[in-house]
């Protein structure tokens, strides 16, 4: 698994993290992390698509 950690060890770590931060705080952190990842993916994907407001080389206003 992850660096030699099994399911039992991961479960113990999860229980300790929930005990330290609390279930409500952990849910908030998870939501913030999810929205951050979503925004990052949207920004990365947006760079591949041509922008509609970008001018081409031949289009310059005088």
From Swiss-Prot:
One of its GO terms (cellular component) is TAT protein transport complex. It is found in: Cell membrane. The keyword Glycosyltransferase does not apply. One of its GO terms (biological process) is protein transport by the Tat complex. It holds the Pfam family TatA_B_E. It is a single-pass membrane protein. GO terms for molecular function: protein transmembrane transporter activity. The chain crosses the membrane at residues 10-32. It comes from the Bacteria. Keywords: Cell membrane, Membrane, Protein transport, Translocation, Transmembrane, Transmembrane helix, Transport. Forms a complex with TatC. HAMAP family: TatA_E. Belongs to the TatA/E family. Part of the twin-arginine translocation (Tat) system that transports large folded proteins containing a characteristic twin-arginine motif in their signal peptide across membranes. TatA could form the protein-conducting channel of the Tat system. This is Sec-independent protein translocase protein TatA. It comes from Chloroflexus aurantiacus (strain ATCC 29366 / DSM 635 / J-10-fl).
């Amino acid at each position: 698994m992850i660096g030699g950690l099994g399911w039992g060890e991961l479960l113990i770590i999860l229980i300790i993290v929930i005990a330290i931060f609390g279930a409500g705080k952990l849910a908030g952190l998870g939501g913030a992390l999810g929205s951050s990842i979503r925004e990052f993916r949207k920004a990365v994907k947006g760079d591949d698509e041509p922008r509609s407001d970008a001018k081409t080389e031949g289009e310059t206003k005088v």
